[in-house]
Amino acid sequence: MVELLGIIRIRGWAKAPWYINETLNMLRLRYNFNTMVYPKTSQILGMLNKVSPYITWGEIDPDTLKLLIINRLETVKGDKVSDSYVKEVLKIENIDAMVKQLYEGKIYLHKLDEYFKLPIRLHPPRGGFKGSVKRPYKNKGEFGYRGDKINELMRRMV
């Protein structure tokens, strides 16, 4: 079973050094409130640590991933993702089976460019951020690693 990381960009590009913007572009997080789902690897973790003042991330659970796919993921044509679309293009029975295969490591969401519009665009969080986006999560802020609390934030942003 593969651990999946949900990564959300929470700060803009102005006054960010070029190497931060370049790394965020590699992660496909070009704009505020864009999110991507990646498997937990040492390469990804190194990139996340480099750009941590501009993003927040943590381990995403299957329920939140399913909610994200159903409500915010779009097809290439701009339509919402449905069970019939997943069955037609990916040859997978439904969205539940797709989430299961994502967690088994058989398919990777970030490599499905020809079927979905990536990155996934989110709303700002309902109720606003609970802390400052200029402080780390551990010190009553918002940026950086937050573990499984990323699910709570993503549910407020869907």
UniProtKB/Swiss-Prot annotation:
It comes from the Archaea. GO terms for molecular function: RNA binding; structural constituent of ribosome. GO terms for cellular component: cytosolic large ribosomal subunit. GO terms for biological process: maturation of LSU-rRNA from tricistronic rRNA transcript (SSU-rRNA, 5.8S rRNA, LSU-rRNA); translation. CDD domains: Ribosomal_L7_archeal_euk (cd01657). The keyword Ribosomal protein applies. It holds the Pfam family Ribosomal_L30. Keywords: Ribonucleoprotein, Ribosomal protein. HAMAP family: Ribosomal_uL30_A. Part of the 50S ribosomal subunit. NCBIfam families: PRK06049.1 (NF004711), uL30_arch (TIGR01309). PANTHER family: 60S RIBOSOMAL PROTEIN L7, LARGE RIBOSOMAL SUBUNIT PROTEIN UL30. Belongs to the universal ribosomal protein uL30 family. This is Large ribosomal subunit protein uL30.
